[in-house]
Amino acid sequence: MSATGGEAAGIFLDLGARVAETLARLREARGVTVGGSARRAVWRHGKTTLYRYLPLEQAERGAERPLLICFALVNRPYILDLEPEFSLVRRLLEAGLTVYLIDWGDADDGDRLRDLNDYIESELGGCVRHILDAHGIEALDLMGVCQGGVFTLCYTALHPQQVANLVTLTAPVDFQTPEDLLSKWLRGIDTELLARAGNVPGEMLNAIFLSLMPFRLMQQKYVRLLTGRSDRRAVETFVRMERWIFDSPPQAAVAFTEFIRWLYQENRLVRGTLSLGGRHVDLGRIRQPILNLYAAGDHIVPPAASAAMGRYVGSSDYTACAIETGHIGMYVSRKGRAEIPGRIISWLRERQGRRGPAR
Amino acid sequence: MQNPFAASPLSPDAVFAGAAERFFELLKTFGLQAASGAGGAPEWSSVAGALAQQFEQWLGASPALGASLAASAGFSPAGAPWAFGQVPLGMAAASGGEGENPWELLVRLAQLQGQLAGHWSEIAKSSAEKFVTRLRAGGAPVGELTSEGALKLYELWVECAEEAYARTVRTEEFCHLQAQLANTSTALLLAQRRQADALARAWGLPTREEADALQRQIRELRDELAAKPAAKGAAKSGAKPAAQPAAKSAAAPAAEPPARPARAARAGERSSPKRRAAKSAKRARRGRRPRA
């Protein structure tokens, strides 16, 4: 390999021009919006809001049972409706599903003592009960995303009569698989001390997630933006993603530390030692049909952490599927977009006519 | 449609510009080396030192779990933005009080940060060595250093860096260090807060401890209220209009439900007291669990 001074200067000039162009596009894209699907708030409690998405005019014939999406506490749910092209919510609406979504809001100082039982029993439970009453039905379909997947598993185990079908996306179950770097880092954290320090800022969560793969996540992706497709639309999508990645909400101190201690440190879900509000969470009680979708290249929830679900649930109708993408790629990659909505819709349709689980 | 970014301090173009600047620094290093080998094979081993140095500096300024928590407690030299909150009295406040001695904590934190720096150095060195080894093994782009060639070098560099990083940060020693950093910086933050509380008390202002005690009281009261059967019955029949709207408008659901959302849910989109009472009776007949 050789390069003359003139050639090297040419490379820098070329790249310099690309940087300037990309920067200009990034600046133009600062005003981008997210969450294009129309929705209305139908229930609120504390910081939690339950949204119902309005049906699309061009949607297919509606389904019988509504679908409630429970997202993680550690990120914002608008990733599911980032823009029309990358919107799981929109695909579900187009298929005629009635879609509800929980937005946990931002925990503030008054929420320091809010615990996991509050989030799962009172907030998620409140949303479920609202929907059941509003539709006059006995059971709904539940979809849990990432940490929200853990919540939906817990809720279904505790209230099996209220859930007809369960869909989980990148949901960890075994928190101590060998590949789980986050778990290794969190094992030695003094959770009592951390809880006393108060709510955990979202920025700290962002930093932790980024530090799992710092060069790819904090350097390489920007360089790729320089060299890849950088038309206005692609840059806008990039900016939306960036905003989402850096937009983690603050975490209620007690709930956050309970999650670390009970799940990452003590792995209670698979050891069968998790209790919420004095009630034992037994995954074996989940006999509902389950569709478990996880990412084969996930650096936050390793595939083995999610695939373990099949060993612990009591369902005889359990379908697991690894999608060849990463954690965030599940919602925004072409692969995820091409596979995930279709799988969820057809899986739910196959089970729509069936009755809910036996009580 | 919403724009959740309006108030966000994050500026993607600034982050991008920072990454581009570091990318250019790397390219300069690659380019200089390539130029030095013009007419012959470049000696990449001489570039390893420069790469490792650049890399180590970047690592030192980047967040890792322990470092994040240390920064969050206000003890990062870089003054990272992810703070639990500003420490009101600065370092001078970290003295006296109960619990661990803040100065001892500070010393321990400095020692831990020194150990962390040692790991960054190890990762940087290992990355550079890997990079050079792979280049020698045929990973280097052949021919003139074009934009594409430079990018290939960059991709190889990132791959080597990520591998070296992963190998170190998965070790028990590193994980233990991370946890110690996090725990020590949290302990230091709490020590400072104790000091701030002491001052607040002296000035007759409410303290963090008192606010926490009040929150606990409110929570206990809520739990007690929810546990009372009479309260449940009253809520089921919609007999608490002051706290619970009889029916919420779906379009304007701003009204705060009562303490237990389960009961709030009963006062749903299309309920009336009569209807709710009938539903409750129906549920009771079916032996359905009370919604708590």
Task: Annotate the PLM regions.
Chain A
Residues I286, N292-Y294, D298:
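Short beta-strand/loop motif that positions the catalytic acidic residue
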Residues G35-D108:
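Short, surface-exposed "cap/lid" segments of acyl-processing enzymes
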Residues R114-A134:
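Alpha/beta-hydrolase active-site loop
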Residues M1-G35, P357-R359:
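N-terminal targeting or regulatory segments adjacent to alpha/beta-hydrolase or S9 domains
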Residues A320, E324-E339:
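Catalytic histidine-centered segment of alpha/beta-hydrolase-like enzymes
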